[in-house]
């Protein structure tokens, strides 16, 4: 299998990776978030058109395997397990989340967020995630925090999300890894 960066259909996101790495580093710094000890299990894209999502899907099918395809919040989301990971900071992401466009318009097509796993009680996720962020960082202009509980059609585990964004790049926190969530769907 080919490396994802060598696939024609993925050249735009291969070129976008340095921008995302810089933006993620900058957001982490602004938030006072030390990412070094944290486990992030996947990286996600955003696009504006179904044609882009279909093209990226064709590309990922050439360099990985479809792990899951599910309807979440009214739109398809595919998870791909790549044979060669996406390198961001000290993380090696073998799982890529590819959502189709939804109602929300994102300012950029390309890499948009990472998801950090904070194992523990889902009820305490928000407090545990916020404790990692500086009060000063959270009060900066343009920084926003959102909580949600996205749920796949067959998902069995409660999977709350705390997302922190500057409007361009987002860091999300979950109590479960994406592979644990997929396993819960498959046992449904």
Curated annotation (Swiss-Prot):
Signal peptide segment: none
Pfam families for the chain: YecM
One GO CC term, this protein: cytosol
SUPFAM superfamilies: Glyoxalase/Bleomycin resistance protein/Dihydroxybiphenyl dioxygenase (SSF54593)
NCBIfam families assigned to the protein according to its UniProt record, in alphabetical order: PRK11700.1-1, PRK11700.1-4, PRK11700.1-5
Recorded family membership: To H.influenzae HI_1582/HI_1581.
Official protein name in the record: Protein YecM
Source organism per UniProt: Escherichia coli (strain K12)
Gene name of this polypeptide: yecM
């Amino acid at each position: 299998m080919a490396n994802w960066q060598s696939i024609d259909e993925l050249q735009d996101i291969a070129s976008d990776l340095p921008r995302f790495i810089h933006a993620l580093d900058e957001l982490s710094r602004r938030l006072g978030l030390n990412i070094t000890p944290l486990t992030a299990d996947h990286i996600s894209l955003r696009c504006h058109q179904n044609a882009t999502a279909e093209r990226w899907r064709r590309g990922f099918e050439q360099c990985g395997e479809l792990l899951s395809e599910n309807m979440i919040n009214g739109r398809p989301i595919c998870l791909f397990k790549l044979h060669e990971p996406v390198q961001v900071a000290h993380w090696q992401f073998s799982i890529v989340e590819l959502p189709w466009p939804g109602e929300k318009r994102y300012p950029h097509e390309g890499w948009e967020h990472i998801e950090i796993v904070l194992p523990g009680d889902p009820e305490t996720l928000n407090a545990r995630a916020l404790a990692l962020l500086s009060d000063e960082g959270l009060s900066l202009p343009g920084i926003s925090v959102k909580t949600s509980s996205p749920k796949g059609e067959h998902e069995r585990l409660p999977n709350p999300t705390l997302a922190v964004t500057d409007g361009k790049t987002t860091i999300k926190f979950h109590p479960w890894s994406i592979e644990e969530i997929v396993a819960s769907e498959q046992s449904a």
